[in-house]
Amino acid sequence: KHFFYYYLYILKLKSNKMRKYIYPLIIFLFASKAFSHTSHYEGLKKIEMDVVRNGEVIGYTNYYFEKEDDIMTVKNYTKFKVKLMGVTVFSILSEATEKYENDNLIYFKSNTFQNNKEKYVNLNYDKSLKKFIIDGSSYKGEASLDCIIGNWWNHKIFTSSKQISPLSGSIKEQIVTFIGKEKININNKEYLTEHFKLKSKNQNLPDDKKLNF
């Protein structure tokens, strides 16, 4: 069994009565395989992730895989809440579907409620243009084929220079840094992990628009 972990930083959560807070979360991923190409996921049925804050599981993001001929379909269900003194300050409820043909993304659709605000993405591959066409809550237009969906199941997220937000469709250039291999202990069992950091290339973006994982 392979094991990975990611630090997810929510940089800015604001209300009229709140200061700026930083909430470190850890996403734990358990799977029998984890590779950089979709063809390597053959035989894999699901990847389950726990979202953990301060040692407590506060939600999940789970992926389910289906393969038929040359088409692989990935379905995602995500739900978690961050609470401060009993008050929910950040929440995600999301469903998404990705489709790949011969390892190439051809379709993506998601519906998300982030802090009860609705977001969405509809993406299709245009064969004549050889580009992605995106209709999203934050972006509508074209995207080059070197963009990937910013979902954690796909190891390509660590090799790509651009990602498409799975929540809103916005395109962000990113810088990926491999921090190193680390050993962590969970439930009295030791795991060798790989620790990466993802940041937005454009540091002039507002904090709530930046990548900082």
Model-derived regions, located:
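Polybasic, lysine-rich low-complexity intrinsically disordered segments
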Residues: K1, K12-K14
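Aromatic (phenylalanine/tyrosine) cluster motif
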Residues: F3-Y9, F30
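Positively charged n-region of N-terminal signal peptides that target proteins for export
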Residues: K14-Y21
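Sec-dependent N-terminal signal peptides
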Residues: Y21-F30
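Boundary at the C-terminal end of the N-terminal hydrophobic targeting segment
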Residues: A34-T38
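Solvent-exposed helix/loop surface patches that form functional interfaces
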Residues: E42-L44, N111-L205
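N-terminal mature ectodomain segment of secretory-pathway/periplasmic proteins
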Residues: K45-K127
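Gly/Pro-enriched, hydrophobic low-complexity segments
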Residues: K75, S91, T193-F213
